[in-house]
Amino acid sequence: NMSGDPEQEFFADGIAEDIITALSRYPSLFVIARNSSFSFKGRAVDVKQVGRELGVRYVLEGSLRKSGNRVRVTAQLVEAETGNHVWAERYDRYLADIFAVQDEITQATTIAIAPAIADAEQQRAMRKPPASLDAWGAYQRGMWHLSKASAEDNGLAEKFFQRAIDLDPMFVGGYVGLSAVLSRAKGTQSREEALARRAVALDGGDAEAHSRLALALLAGGDHQGACAQAERALAICPNLAAAHGALGVALAYSGRPTDGLAALEACIRLDPRDPSLVNRLNQLALAHYFCHDYEAAVEAAERAIRSFPDFPSPYRWLAAALGELGRTEEAKTALEKAITVSPDSFDFQVRQRPPWFRPEEHSHMLDGLKKAGWEG
């Protein structure tokens, strides 16, 4: 509290306490409790010293200033060992409702910090020789490769996640990551689900594990179970983007695309730099399509294609949406691309009807593709 107003001490402490509570819900973060972190309050201490004394890799520090009915909160995330800034932000707010402002700043800070730490940890792991990695480092290397979405990177991600499990069979992240990799391969749904169930069994309070299980259940056609697991994840960690994403796609494929859209939009808003953004945009396109909002489906699919031109699924939704809009020539071009980018994916998604597709949604997609020129 740098405002000079003793009354703002409670406001500053409230924000700090709420951020500690919110961050502690993220399964990938180890967060020091209030009593220990508050022991540094008001002291001019070196961030490296704080890191050593608390045994943490990152330190979040901030300040509060008040002028009239306005308050300014600044926050910065620092890597304790090096003193390098990982993230910083400033929030200026009117104090009409002090608790609303406290909640708003807490949420804004929390949803920014978790992805920033994830990025920093992946970069840190990539700088280390593979042979020197512990389970956490192997997991982070796996996550880095997983985000690239190429066949080669998927193979490397699988190896690093398996190594994380071998190094620490009780480490939930290894099972979550390996399940995620297997979701990209054919004929692996049962193992994908088993790994996700193992993660949940190891830690029933891990929101990321429940989110992964939701997607594995959806891949097997269990729409109700998928929604239930995603909702459980959100109950544990309301700001976890992956949980909103899992719920969104599960709802979209369950005949509730409007509700699915709201969850998917929340997911993208919470983590706009998500390495899985192409999946989110593709899911946004299909949810809009199922809502019969074909213009919005085209927009979402084109956004995905601009960022990830080698990802096949958005071309399929683009072709179907353009077909429904009667934009035949554009639809034919998109259809050709959907087939040529990945013939196997097109065959699986279109001709075979994967388990996550209910007959009614699948027929709806086929109608659009036929209008785009697909002859079956």
What do the predicted segments below correspond to?
Residues N1-L325, E330, S345:
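Acidic, proline/glycine-rich low-complexity intrinsically disordered segments
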Residues Q122-A125, L335, M365:
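Generic structural signal of hydrophobic/aromatic residues within well-ordered alpha-helices
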Residues T328-K332, E336-S342:
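Short, charge-rich, low-complexity interaction segments located
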Residues D347-G376:
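Terminal, low-structured helical/coil segments at or just beyond the last alpha-helical repeat
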